[in-house]
């Protein structure tokens, strides 16, 4: 990943492509994988690399991940709730309506890390797109892509329920997930795991996703990504 000047997120099934300028120095990369050193801590199951446009705990609503293009929200949602008061029934309602993305994707047009518009690919997909629009009408910050995560655990099975451990799910060769909302500043942090999306280098090499071999996103090059091994999940507080 570090040898490439940018990454492409491609879904050939729905003809979407987005460019991610992943080497910006104002990002922070978090790792929940690899050997656990003395005094360290990881979630179980481990196996996630994620990037945010800010350092852990330093919230700034103007910061952005440089993502531009069209992305397919096609896969399994996770709806995490933060510290503000909420009802479990409301959290479950959001999860259930977004769960149609398992079979009926929504296409998002993204400009500089912000979702400009949504396109339902079917009548069924409108359930998810309308739910998302309702969230944005209450808090427009849900349009910001706060996190891009890469699940690297190809040995685990996904839990078909609203469960945070699914973030580590790596399908066959790694799986991307898009993170919307950032607790505790928004009520919810929503992840959409999209195994169908390919992550490609600037030369077209498939780094993760699909049916190719999973490549280590941490390979070295002259330019390094700012990363740290996180004690907690940076996107949930």
Predicted features by range, described:
Residues 94, 99-103, 121-136:
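Conserved mixed alpha/beta catalytic, RNA-binding, or beta-rich assembly cores of soluble enzyme
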Residues 26, 87-89, 125, 164-166, ...:
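Short, solvent-exposed amphipathic alpha-helical segments in soluble enzyme
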Residues 42, 130-158, 228-237:
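Short, solvent-exposed cationic patches
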Residues 10, 73-75, 152, 180-182, ...:
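Pocket-edge structural micro-motifs
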């Amino acid at each position: 990943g570090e040898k490439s000047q940018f990454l492409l997120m491609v879904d050939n099934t729905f003809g979407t492509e987005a460019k991610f300028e992943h080497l910006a120095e104002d990002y922070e990369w978090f790792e929940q994988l690899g050997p656990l050193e003395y005094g360290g801590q990881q979630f179980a199951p481990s196996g996630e690399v994620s990037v945010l446009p800010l350092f852990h705990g330093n919230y700034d609503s103007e910061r952005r991940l440089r993502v531009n293009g069209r992305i397919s929200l096609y896969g399994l949602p996770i709806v995490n709730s933060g510290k503000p008061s909420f009802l479990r029934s409301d959290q479950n309602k959001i999860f259930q309506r977004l769960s149609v993305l398992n079979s009926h994707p929504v296409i998002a047009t993204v400009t500089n890390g912000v979702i400009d518009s949504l396109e339902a690919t079917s009548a069924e997909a409108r359930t998810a797109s309308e739910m998302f629009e309702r969230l944005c009408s209450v808090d427009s910050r849900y349009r910001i892509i706060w996190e891009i995560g890469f699940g690297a655990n190809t040995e685990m099975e996904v839990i078909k329920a609203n469960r945070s451990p699914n973030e580590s799910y790596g399908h066959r060769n790694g799986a991307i997930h898009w993170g919307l909302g950032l607790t505790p500043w928004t009520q919810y942090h929503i992840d959409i795991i999209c195994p169908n999306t390919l992550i490609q280098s600037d030369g077209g090499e498939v780094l993760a996703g699909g049916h190719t071999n999973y490549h280590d996103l941490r390979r070295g090059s002259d330019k390094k990504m700012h990363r740290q091994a996180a004690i907690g999940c940076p996107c949930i507080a």
